Amino acid sequence: MKMDMQRRILTTICQMYYEQNLTQQQIANKTGLTRMKISRSLQKAKDMGIVRIIIDYSGLYLELESEINSKYQLKETIIVDSSMNNDMKNQVASTAAYYLESNLTKNSTIAIGWGSTMSRVSNFIQDMSNMKLLFSPIIGGHGKSELDMHATTISSNLAKKTGCNSLSLLAPALVKSKKEKELLMDDTHIKEVINQTKRADYALFSLGSPLVKDSSLSKSGYLSDDGLKQLKDEGAVCDIVSIAFLNKDGNICCKNITDRSVGISESDLKNIPLKICIVEGEEKHDAVK
């Protein structure tokens, strides 16, 4: 009988709190109990199973995100539900745009990578002119095919959509020789842009699977058959803005190629305080690992 009465009191308090939306103080005033007693009663009701809290995790993967954060020592992971939209590139790009809008700080410089998913971010980003942002390319890419996916073009498009500014790196992403790269890197304008990108507060980039037929790198036309063969021979599975390639063990490979890339270096990218990497597609699994 005592237990039935206790349950009745606890249930009544819960009904007032959860269904009538009364505050703990209002319930205390109404019942003549102290606010502390109301707080303890609500907790006891949870412990007894009178109240069950159900969180709708549909489309969310918080536990998996937490595991990934712990395993790879990441600040934050966002997994986009593939069942939400048939066009996953747009879904990932819109999520990246929202993340930028929510996290960038005023007067920041954002280093920008290249790729097909990256090229769509500007389609979803909102005006941020009050933030006075600067978008700066991580790597060159001017004057080649698939212009819309190059870092300079993406930087420019992001600047236009946000009402902010961008820099242009008017050079190829990859040149034919290390000597040609050194000559370009000695150009005053190119040097200034690269130095500005090195000082970026954020980096927004994607990962590529260099050996996939329709990868951004293969579409760009920068690599010869010999270059593609080198990627295969050295087991490259991950393309980081074409300034670094990794094998399945996570080790740097294909230095002969990255020694010819015109942009910041892999160590420069590491030194940028906050890096935001967006990845989409099953073919990127090995690149992400």
Residue ranges and their predicted role:
Residues C14, L22, T31, I55-K178, ...:
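N-terminal active-site beta-alpha-beta segment that forms phosphate/nucleotide-binding
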